[in-house]
């Protein structure tokens, strides 16, 4: 059995044991998530004081080209729910997101997550990164480094960073600045709200490698879209 299969099997077991319970607890008993109510929260915020998600992430979940805030459109509802609950509990630290998540009820979190997973938003046109940097990132993402015992990113995040829902997020088309920042948080021990796989891997990457992986994943989705559009012409 390959490492990827072993890891995904382990993740599936953890999800089966704890993930379903978390999702059930994240909303009122017997209630189905309401994407329309989620859209209202994204646009207007809540009476409890949570600001509109759209202020930073945009109504369609693409955020902005700066990469200061992640792209949320199409991300798995389970993953988004877990992150919001972790922000609220303090398991994932953020001076910005923690107070916002605390102002959201369990139903609010479920509704917002369900809204974003259903959004099919375009990818913003971004400046092309350095080709050599992207090539280096592609090698790390697809092959890794056997010599340094660095697993390739695609093992967990899927071919081309498409993600492995429900627990593992997509990276394809995510902003390079955000990916690099998140890897730095894992490396420095400031983020640890999941299995320590990411912390172990991030600690083996230097700054240039982090920048390379981030640059590769930022452009991989737009490249796929270009190929698809050319095929239709």
Predicted segment positions?
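The canonical Cys-X-X-Cys-His
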Residues: 50-59, 112, 150-160, 213
């Amino acid at each position: 059995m390959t490492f990827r299969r072993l890891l995904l099997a382990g993740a599936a077991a953890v999800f089966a044991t704890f993930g379903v319970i978390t999702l059930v607890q994240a909303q009122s008993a017997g209630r189905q998530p309401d994407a329309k109510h989620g859209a209202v929260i994204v646009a207007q915020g809540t009476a409890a004081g949570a600001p509109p998600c759209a202020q930073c992430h945009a109504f369609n979940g693409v955020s902005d080209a700066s990469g200061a805030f992640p792209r949320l459109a199409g991300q798995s509802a389970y993953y988004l729910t877990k992150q919001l609950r972790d922000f609220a509990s303090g398991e994932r630290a953020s001076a910005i997101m923690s107070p916002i998540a605390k102002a959201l009820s369990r139903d609010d979190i479920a509704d917002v997550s369900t809204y974003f997973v259903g959004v099919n938003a375009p990818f913003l046109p971004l400046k092309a990164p350095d080709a050599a940097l992207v090539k280096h990132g592609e090698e790390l993402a697809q092959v890794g480094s056997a010599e340094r015992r660095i697993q390739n990113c695609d093992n967990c995040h899927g071919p081309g960073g498409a993600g492995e829902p429900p627990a593992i997020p997509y990276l394809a088309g995510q902003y390079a600045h955000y990916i690099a920042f998140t890897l730095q948080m894992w490396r420095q021990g400031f983020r640890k709200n999941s299995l320590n796989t990411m912390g172990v891997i991030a600690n083996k990457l230097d700054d240039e490698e982090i920048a390379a992986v981030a640059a590769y994943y930022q452009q991989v989705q737009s490249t796929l879209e270009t190929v698809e559009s050319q095929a239709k012409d």
